[in-house]
Amino acid sequence: MTFNVRLLTRHFYDAEGVLLPQEIIVYTDYVCPFCLLAEEAIVQATDDLDVEIRWRPFELRPDPVPTLKVEDPYLPLVWRDSVYPMAEKLGVPITLPNISPQPRTDKAFEVFAMAEEQGVGHPYSMAALKAFFQQERDIGDPEVLADIGESVGLERQAVLDALAEGRYREQHQAAQRHAVDEARIQSVPTLVIDGEVIQGVPDPAALKRFLIERG
């Protein structure tokens, strides 16, 4: 599939003029199936490239916006026409979770902030996406989030305590404000590569060419 690119800036160098490794910033929401598919596209595109992947939160439906319901016509239609065909093409196992209404993701992103602090933001994001779309687990449930956190090396009780105390709430809210007000994110997945914005799930081969041309 094609993807849209919005040019902002070009490469970044360190103080000595050395070109830094390319960085892919991925704005995501853990209840967006295309975000899981985008991750696989990125993996395929960057298999032999020097690229660093950084995840950033963007809640598609922050409180009080209602979340989606499985019984509404919209979700089954989108999955039938877009999600499942793309997942098959990329080789990603995925299922429409039978959880209705879909969970909010603010708590999941609070745990992401904790995971980032401990250097496991990337594996946590992948585990959260897979928990929802491959295991049909409710990622709005603190106990489920504690399980996910523990699976990537966080202390389970520390996750529960942090959620109960709202320890990372403001940090997540600040990240959400940044995504909306400064980065001007409107949809996910959105990739930012060396300052260039790519919206949607990229074709792995096209993304690889895009990275090599700017490498």
For each of these PLM feature ranges, what is it?
Residues 1-19:
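N-terminal amphipathic/basic-hydrophobic helices that include classical n-h-c signal peptides
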Residues 16-19, 25, 34-51, 74, ...:
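C-terminal cap of thioredoxin/glutaredoxin-like
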Residues 25-27, 56:
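Solvent-exposed beta-strand sheet faces enriched in polar/charged residues
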Residues 30:
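Cys/His-enriched microdomains
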Residues 36-135:
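Structural alpha/beta surface segment adjacent to cysteine/selenocysteine redox centers
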